[in-house]
Regions:
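N-terminal intrinsically disordered/low-complexity leader segments
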Residues: 1-12, 202-207
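Short, basic, alpha-helical segments at the C-terminal edge of helix-turn-helix-like DNA-binding modules
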Residues: 65-70
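Residues in soluble alpha-helical coiled-coils and helical-bundle/repeat scaffolds
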Residues: 54-58, 80-84, 116, 120, ...
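Hydrophobic alpha-helical connector segments
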Residues: 62, 73-105, 157-161, 183, ...
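Amphipathic alpha-helical segments used for helix-helix packing
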Residues: 88, 100-122
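A ubiquitous short alpha-helical element
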Residues: 58-59, 91-98, 123-130
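Helix-turn-helix
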Residues: 13-16, 20-58, 62
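Hydrophobic/aromatic-rich alpha-helical bundle segments in the mid-to-C-terminal region
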Residues: 122-126, 130, 144-207
Length: 207
């Protein structure tokens, strides 16, 4: 560790600590975000991190919210790029089960476990789950209005879909079934929930 520390403003140091925490979480999950690990990542003494981030529970919660919030923004943009609700829903769900999202999947899975002992994290998780459910319900509602989907309660269906996504992504961490099989299983289930003909969503997957 350097014997001298570059002096930075409070805002700069806070941003640096936040960036380091996010980098650690993406590399090894939320459990890797510890005072000592963040300090090592930044290249400063743990006491300096503690000064600018006095609550590790808050830092972990904020790290989670930043990473999954970025993912939601990315997926919202993906949905907007599609011309129909059916195309948007199929693209979004396939993206969420893509193996390239393994780092965020681990963060989600650990958040439910760690949130049992970290109420700040638990609150962030609930907020993000609500945001994701609202987003999916919006896509479904657009499809219902356009006559593509048939359902009575888009919000309830969105919650059920998220439960399936979370479960299948958890399965992916131990390589149970391959990604294409998990995606087809999910889309076929959603087709039934939205009263669609078989393959309306599955048929939109790349061959």
């Amino acid at each position: 560790m350097p014997s001298t520390v570059t002096r930075r403003s409070a805002a700069e140091r806070t941003a640096q600590i936040s960036s380091a925490a996010q980098s650690l979480a993406r590399e090894a999950g939320l459990s890797a975000v510890t005072l000592r690990a963040v300090a090592t990542e930044v290249g400063v003494a743990p006491a300096l991190v503690a000064h600018y981030a006095p609550s590790m529970d808050t830092l972990v919660g904020d790290t989670f919210a930043a990473i999954v919030g970025d993912e939601l923004s990315e997926v919202e943009e993906l949905a907007r790029s599609r011309s129909t609700a059916s195309d948007a829903l199929a693209a979004v769900l396939a993206s969420l089960l893509d193996e390239g999202r393994a780092e965020v999947t681990l963060i989600w899975v650990q958040s439910w476990s760690l949130g049992g002992r970290n109420e700040t994290l638990a609150a962030r998780v609930r907020e993000q789950m609500d945001a994701w459910r609202t987003f999916l319900a919006g896509v479904i509602d657009v499809g219902r209005g356009a006559g593509e989907f048939r359902c009575d309660d888009p919000l309830a269906i969105a919650g059920q879909i998220l439960g399936m996504v979370d479960g299948l992504n958890a399965h992916s961490l131990v390589a149970w079934q391959d990604a294409s099989e998990r995606t087809r299983l999910l889309l076929r289930s959603v087709e039934a929930m939205l009263d669609l003909e078989p393959d309306v969503l599955v048929g939109r997957l790349p061959v």
